[in-house]
Swiss-Prot record:
PROSITE patterns: FKBP_PPIASE (PS50059). The keyword Isomerase applies. Residues 163-248 form the PPIase FKBP-type domain. Consists of 3 domains; the N-terminus binds the ribosome, the middle domain has PPIase activity, while the C-terminus has intrinsic chaperone activity on its own. Its main location: cytoplasm. This is Trigger factor. InterPro entries: PPIase_dom_sf, PPIase_FKBP_dom, Trig_fac, Trigger_fac_C, Trigger_fac_C_sf, Trigger_fac_ribosome-bd_bac, Trigger_fac_ribosome-bd_sf, Trigger_fact/SurA_dom_sf.
Length: 427
């Protein structure tokens, strides 16, 4: 195989390669076996025409296109490997020469990764808007939230206030016509929770049990039911009950109700503090890592990022997200219906920061290459086991789905991130 690669820009070039006679013969054999099944010729049963007769009747050239399709993927991959390039998109392939008895010559217009010039990526000084410190107020807030979760709702005769729960019947209409989904019975609604259309809950503050009021609201312009978006509606609402939260006393007994592993309120506070310290420490480390990576990317120079890489990243991110939804039993159609969005909306959402994600990945890959990381079989095995645990899949299935080269690449990327983050200093 003769191979050459000529760059036409930093990210584009022409790959020229040939397919030798032995490979062509293999392709022609595959092509003949595929097409002969549909050929009927007098003197032969359907599909039983001989190769000699086929060549005499149609010419061997009739098999060229099918033969090329059979051998091209392997030939192209071999040419890419020999040229030592990394295409990032499907190539545009043209046949330069395809004659009987000669090697076939082809060209491929390919898009490759851009040249990356690394700047500083170790010992970076970064600023983060995060802290590991846990305050007494944060512990008290956690305790108050737990106390609220165990509060009882007690019927009250006085007027409803923010934070109270009202049990209501309601019938909604637009221009005097009731609409689907606008009716409810014995619905519990916490005032101030923002569960209902903006303006609805505020108009129930001050109402009492047994009262019927007319609540006038306007549906948001981006409301998921398009036929209601931006329209004024009237809800005839009857308040059946008003309930107020009755908080339990903060004592050792409540502490045991909140967490059966503790015996006293002080033990519960200590446990909450430890959990907050762990979560804030993790958030702090994440913030440092993010800031350090952003600094390393800013210090690097990338001449241009091919549009093809941006498009590929958008589709990858979309497929990953929608695939995750499907694992939860939510189809793409269902997701778009629930959220009132479309595939185009999701595409725009991921397109907004696709350039940043691609740029970041390219720099991290370049750092991994600069550090010449090696990956042991034990590390690959540990990565497979970790992924199997994350996705609740058998180890054997993960091994089949993910090539070793891909796993080694991911491990090297993690090592590069670790180098960037662990050497960073916080200002």
């Amino acid at each position: 195989m003769t191979v050459s690669f000529e760059k036409t820009s930093d990210t584009k070039g022409t790959l020229s390669f040939s397919i030798d006679q032995e490979t062509i013969k293999t392709g022609l054999d595959k092509a003949f076996n595929k097409v002969k099944a549909n050929i009927s010729v007098p003197g032969f049963r359907k599909g039983k025409i001989s190769r000699q007769m086929f060549n005499k009747m149609y010419g061997e050239e009739a098999l060229f296109e099918e033969a090329l399709n059979a051998v091209l993927p392997t030939a192209y991959d071999a040419a890419v490997k020999e040229a030592a390039i990394e295409p990032v998109a499907q190539p545009k392939i043209d046949v330069a020469k395809m004659e009987k008895g000669s090697d076939w010559e082809l060209t491929a217009e390919v898009v490759v990764k851009p040249t990356i010039t690394l700047g500083d990526y170790k010992d970076l000084t970064v600023e983060v808007d995060a802290t590991k410190e846990v305050t007494d107020e944060e512990v008290e807030t956690r305790l108050t939230n737990a106390q609220n979760n165990l509060a009882e709702l007690v019927v009250k005769e006085t007027a409803a206030e923010n934070g109270d729960t009202v049990v209501i019947d309601f019938v909604g209409s637009v221009d005097g016509v009731e609409f689907e989904g606008g009716k409810g019975s014995n619905h519990s609604l916490e005032l101030g929770s923002g569960q209902f259309i903006p303006g609805f809950e505020e108009q129930l503050v001050g109402t009492k049990s047994g009262e019927t009021v007319e609540v006038k609201v306007t549906f948001p312009e981006n409301y998921q039911a398009e036929d209601l978006a931006g329209k004024e509606a009237l809800f005839v609402t009857t308040v059946n009950e008003v309930k107020a939260k009755e908080l339990p006393e903060l004592d050792d007994e409540l502490a045991k109700d909140i967490d059966e592993e503790v015996e006293t309120l002080e033990e519960l506070k200590a446990k909450f503090r430890k959990e907050l310290e762990e979560s804030k420490s993790e958030a702090y480390d994440d913030a440092v890592e993010t800031a350090a990576i952003e600094a390393a990317v800013a210090n690097a120079e990338i001449k241009e990022i091919p549009e093809e890489m941006i498009h590929e990243e958008v589709h990858r991110a979309m497929n990953e997200f929608l695939g995750g939804m499907q694992q939860q039993g939510i189809s793409p159609e269902m997701y778009f219906q629930i959220t009132g969005t479309s595939e185009d909306d999701l595409h725009k959402q991921y397109e907004a920061d696709a350039d940043k994600r691609v740029r970041t990945n390219l720099v991290i890959e370049a750092i991994a290459a600069a550090e010449s990381f090696t990956t042991s079989d034990e590390e690959v095995k540990a990565e497979i086991e970790d992924l199997a645990g994350q996705y609740n899949m058998p180890v054997e299935q993960v091994e089949k789905l993910l090539p070793v080269d891909m796993l080694k690449h991911d491990i090297a990327m993690k090592k590069a991130v670790e180098v960037i983050a662990t050497t960073a200093k916080v200002k």
